[in-house]
């Protein structure tokens, strides 16, 4: 039976994640908490808007209402990555070789592996940024589509158009597809080799959480009374295919999803704080956490896939251990 270690905090959990074996919880009030031989805290920002672990898992990158982008080490030491004055850093992404991208207003910033900073201007507000899995390429979500840049090189960006507001963005692990979440309760995808559109609609609510399966064969999403999991096994992705619906409940919406690092099993967090795990192959479900305070806002597995860190909008955080 899974065991749950709880950490009751007082603010919305923006990101639950792992640095090595240490679970971290970045809260909207600017504090970052970790469970490392006891509960420890770092006050990183005066208001935190985004947080992601670096690709090597050694630092937690954070962006705040104070215009700062910081890197927190597992021992709590804080280093500065960038500062853009009195602007909100509302989007953040970790890239290869230590590259970092963030956004404020209509500008995306990329700190390259050699430490140089590139500024990329856009005609509309940048809502989200993402790095491609290979090569130094970033994608920006904006109104009416997405923009692709190679920030280390001079050259024209590639514009991908689709009407509406795009609020999240992610590359498939093989780099073949780009997917955005939209304001209008839908996902939109582009097949990058030929620009073909992929419509993934029918959600009753806005999608706020996306997670790729370990081999990139599935993309899980929130925004419905079940985790909606789209198939990406073929060269055309989910074009013309129905998604899996995992962990269906009649009384609560799915608010967060997180795929296991090795198995095609997805952790599903709900608006009432419950967490289930469901398997793609046979849709079998296991209860990981009973309902609690606040909607689940973020979840992340450790590298071994034995422990799941979670956080809620009410600051109800913790770690589920499934190994016992």
Task: Identify the meaning behind each predicted range.
Residues 1-324:
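WD40-repeat beta-propeller superdomains and closely related acidic/aromatic-rich repeat-like regions
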């Amino acid at each position: 039976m899974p065991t749950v270690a709880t950490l009751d905090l007082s603010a919305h959990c923006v990101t639950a994640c792992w640095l090595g074996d240490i679970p971290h919880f970045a809260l909207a009030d600017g504090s970052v908490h970790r469970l490392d031989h006891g509960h420890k805290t770092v006050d990183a920002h005066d208001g935190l808007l985004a947080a992601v672990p670096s690709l090597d898992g050694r630092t937690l990158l954070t962006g705040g209402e104070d215009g700062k982008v910081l890197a927190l080490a597992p021992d709590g030491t804080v280093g500065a990555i960038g500062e853009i004055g009195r602007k909100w850093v509302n989007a953040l992404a970790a890239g290869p070789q230590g590259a970092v991208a963030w956004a404020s207003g209509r500008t995306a910033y990329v700190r390259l592996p050699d430490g140089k900073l590139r500024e990329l201007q856009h005609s509309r507000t940048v809502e989200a940024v993402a790095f491609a899995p290979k090569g130094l390429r970033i994608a920006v979500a904006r109104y009416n589509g997405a923009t692709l840049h190679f920030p280390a090189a001079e050259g024209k960006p590639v514009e991908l158009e689709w009407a509406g507001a795009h609020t999240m963005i992610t590359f498939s692990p093989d780099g073949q597809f780009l997917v955005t979440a939209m304001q209008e309760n839908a996902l939109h995808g582009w097949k990058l080799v030929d620009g073909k559109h992929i419509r993934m609609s029918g959600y009753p609510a806005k999608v706020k959480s996306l997670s790729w399966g370990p081999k990139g064969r599935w993309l899980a999403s929130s925004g419905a009374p079940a985790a909606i999991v789209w198939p990406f096994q073929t060269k055309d992705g989910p074009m013309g295919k129905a998604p899996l619906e995992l962990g269906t409940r009649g009384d609560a919406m799915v608010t967060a999803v997180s795929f296991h690092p090795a198995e095609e099993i997805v952790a599903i967090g709900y608006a009432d704080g419950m967490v289930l795990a469901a398997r793609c192959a046979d849709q079998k479900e296991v209860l990981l956490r009973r309902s609690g305070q606040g909607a689940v806002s973020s979840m992340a597995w450790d590298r071994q896939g034995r422990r799941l860190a979670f956080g809620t909008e009410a600051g109800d955080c913790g770690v589920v251990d499934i190994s016992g």
